From Swiss-Prot:
It is a multi-pass membrane protein. The chain crosses the membrane at residues 18-38, 202-222, 244-264. This is Uncharacterized protein YHL026C. It comes from Saccharomyces cerevisiae (strain ATCC 204508 / S288c) (Baker's yeast). Keywords: Membrane, Transmembrane, Transmembrane helix. It is found in: Membrane. The keyword NADP does not apply. InterPro entries: DUF2456. Residues 288-315 are annotated as: Disordered.
Amino acid sequence: MKSSEPAPATPTGFRNSIWFIIFYLFVIQALGSAIISGGIEFAIAYAMYHSRVDLITLWAFPHTISGDCALSLFIQVGLTWASEEILVGFDDYKRPVFRLNKWITKPSPLKTESNEEIPPPKKRFIVDYFESKDNVVAKQNTLYHKHNWLFGYLEVNRGIIPKGKEATLKGFLTSQFIHDSTQSKFMNFIEWFVQKFIRSMILAIAMFIVIWPVTMGILAGIGHKVGSHDYYFNDYPLPQVMKLIYAVVIAFVCTPVAIIVIVLRNQFHEELYYEGLANGTLQQDQEVCSTGNRSSGSTDQDISTTKQQSQEAVA
């Protein structure tokens, strides 16, 4: 492939600035998620704890706030992850919401034919876990398998190339849920559900290790001591307000992380897709995935069409 052929589409200008990315992650998405999650948790806590005869305690059953907080965290992270996969995933399918190209994009393989030296990225946060020191495109397969834990978590082989004006909800849902055309739609959905559940729970466990103990410490400090090691609370308003704040904190952590995973998945998938074209071969799993999607009529039927759609998506 010649270097004059199209490369992966890259958002430029304001939509690719760090200020837009921060605004999008924490104001547009995380704040909205926090309002919804906080409202739901407040309502649930009101129904659970208001006017209860038994003491509302930190540890003891039947009304244990510690258990409630633990369960709520895992449920909220799982639901947030799934909803962002659909909502943000569809937005990114129509047009990349943003790309982290300035900080973690691999050097384009299309530049390797020139005599210009490829400068290393200024920021190497994720690149260090993704790229080899010399950035040789020929080692693409080696990189893929050597760092498969990152690709595995991001599900890079399930990334979706933006379609621009050609994007449809049906096409997105097919690309999102149908990964193996030889299996039924139900089995494909079960696989999708399991994959998202595993990844969301990995994030939830990491959050639980930090957020839950801190929350329990705060509640122990403001609760009324009962017995040797427990604390009780009034039925209103502390449990309800606490669950609201708890849900807001979770939303501001898990929502940006889920979105970044989606964006990185699509970004890396698109880069590897075009690198495969540049080298005359695609990754095996990407090729199988692409073949399967073609069978379902959801994605690329022609390489040039795909490139044009990808370019139009950010035009």
